[in-house]
């Protein structure tokens, strides 16, 4: 399934824009700051979550606009998706599917979305939180229901942490209820992550070493024990009260990535190797999504071509073209995409998008 038409209203730098896209490569070219990434972000908002920038909803509304925004799409099978906010509730996301109100998590039933952005170059060197979000995005593309477990787990954990940090002894009955929720959703999160990492690791292991480095994957940190998580949390209350936060659960996990051939942690690999590792993970995961869900995910690749040498760039275009699916790419000049073949070419200039 692909995006056939994308319509933006008061989204980022766009007062109004309508984009017609073909089923394969969609290439957006323009100067830095022209608004190319804003278009990719709009596409990413057609799934659960806060999109490829992870921004607050209010930040997405156009400066000088009415205060809300709208992103709408017509898919290749005539399904209509829409999301946005109103000026009266700039941080309350609204979603419609074929004109009917729906939840943001329901969007995952229609589209699987994966992306690579320059900000992700720091994925292996920064803290575990970013890698957990990346892992959950990989899981979500295969198991859309994962979003519900993550959001409910996070809400219960925030409530428990607030109780633990309050003065005086926490309400035991309220803790029991929160820990039951954490146990239910935390177990589902941990199991889904483990399934995805196992399947993805096997697929990556079957890939050649070149041109994209093969990654070895594992989950580190908190590991589910035979004791249910709710019970583990109940027994750990005194420790957690002293710490002022919850110390057990899937929010304490990390995605460990290493260079398989060199047996070297990704954090210690060169910048070029890290890019190749990340690209290899995303490409293998796209194949896994296609296998599990029967349709290719939409790939959003922001400035990826500019950071690859000519050999890897050509290999990337060949691999993407052979695999199929819709791939949105951005770059400052058309020459970066020489050899890409048939594509929808779009020129982006200061809040306007035109066929190139």
UniProtKB/Swiss-Prot annotation:
Cellular component, GO annotation: cytoplasm
GO biological process: DNA replication; DNA synthesis involved in DNA repair; double-strand break repair; SOS response
A matching Pfam family: SMC_N
Keywords: ATP-binding, Cytoplasm, DNA damage, DNA repair, DNA replication, DNA-binding, Nucleotide-binding, SOS response
Positions of ATP binding: 30-37
Cellular location(s): Cytoplasm
UniProt-recorded name of the protein: DNA replication and repair protein RecF
Organism: Rhizorhabdus wittichii (strain DSM 6014 / CCUG 31198 / JCM 15750 / NBRC 105917 / EY 4224 / RW1) (Sphingomonas wittichii)
């Amino acid at each position: 399934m692909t995006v056939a038409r994308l319509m933006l209203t008061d989204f980022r730098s766009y007062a109004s824009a309508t984009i017609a896209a073909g089923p394969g490569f969609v290439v957006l070219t323009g100067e830095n700051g022209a608004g190319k990434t804003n278009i990719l972000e709009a596409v990413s908002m057609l799934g659960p979550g806060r999109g490829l920038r992870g921004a607050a909803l209010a930040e997405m509304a156009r400066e000088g606009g009415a205060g809300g925004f709208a992103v709408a799409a017509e898919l290749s099978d005539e399904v209509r998706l829409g999301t946005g906010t109103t000026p009266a509730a700039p941080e309350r996301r609204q979603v419609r599917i074929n004109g009917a109100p729906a939840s943001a998590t329901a969007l995952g039933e229609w589209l699987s979305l994966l992306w690579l952005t320059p900000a992700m170059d720091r994925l292996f060197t920064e803290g575990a939180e970013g890698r957990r979000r990346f892992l959950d995005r990989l899981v979500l593309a295969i198991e859309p229901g994962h979003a519900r477990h993550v959001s409910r787990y996070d809400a219960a954990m925030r409530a428990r942490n607030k109780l633990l940090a309050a003065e005086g002894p926490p309400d035991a009955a309220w803790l029991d209820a929160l820990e039951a929720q954490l146990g239910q959703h935390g177990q589902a999160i941990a199991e889904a992550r483990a399934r995805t990492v196992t399947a993805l690791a096997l697929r990556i292991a079957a890939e050649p070493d070149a041109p994209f480095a093969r990654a070895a994957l594992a989950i580190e940190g908190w590991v589910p024990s035979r004791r249910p998580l709710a019970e583990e949390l109940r027994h750990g209350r005194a420790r957690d009260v002293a710490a002022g936060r919850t110390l057990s659960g899937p929010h304490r996990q990390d995605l460990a990535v290493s260079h398989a051939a060199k047996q070297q942690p990704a954090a210690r690999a060169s910048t070029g190797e890290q890019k190749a590792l990340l690209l290899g993970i995303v490409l293998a995961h796209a194949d896994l999504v296609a296998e599990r869900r029967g349709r290719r995910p939409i790939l959003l690749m922001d400035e990826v071509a500019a950071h690859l040498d000519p050999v890897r760039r050509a290999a990337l275009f060949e691999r993407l073209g052979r695999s199929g699916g819709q791939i949105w790419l951005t770059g400052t000049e058309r020459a970066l995409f020489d050899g890409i073949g048939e594509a929808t070419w779009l020129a982006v200039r200061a809040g306007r998008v035109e066929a190139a």
